[in-house]
């Protein structure tokens, strides 16, 4: 039983190599999906979150089919390792996105893990009751616009200093 999702093909591989093999990869994805459905926001290495995102979106699509659909129930039973989360998928998450086609998750990069400097990310279902994630600041002093503004300010201050200096010397009579 496989959940088919298109992925970028890279020299014959259609998915990332995670874990110890294909079975380990599936177990890892199932555990991540279960955690996401339970908590509606999880933190994990960026590659795992990016790989899991498509499966999380597809799981909501199956949830929207309803709990009377046999295929949807089989998919929910396979991907959710904790069976008490199956009603949450069909009764809480699927109705939340009934008018939305795709884009159920939000993924944000967070600072790297301190031990091994692994690139980390947070994935969450949109519309959850958790406090919103802070947006990253994009107005760094290194952006092109801020560099240009800084140069303009320096030019203006230099021209003002030059004009002040010339007017000051013109006003004071020579002794």
Swiss-Prot record:
It comes from the Eukaryota. It is found in: Mitochondrion. One of its GO terms (cellular component) is mitochondrial large ribosomal subunit. One of its GO terms (molecular function) is protein domain specific binding. Residues 157-175 have a biased composition (Polar residues). One of its GO terms (biological process) is translation. Residues 155-175 are annotated as: Disordered. Residues 1-8 form a transit peptide. Gene3D superfamilies: Ribosomal protein L17 (3.90.1030.10). InterPro entries: Ribosomal_bL17, Ribosomal_bL17_sf. Keywords: Mitochondrion, Ribonucleoprotein, Ribosomal protein, Transit peptide. Its main location: mitochondrion. Component of the mitochondrial ribosome large subunit (39S) which comprises a 16S rRNA and about 50 distinct proteins. Belongs to the bacterial ribosomal protein bL17 family. This is Large ribosomal subunit protein bL17m.
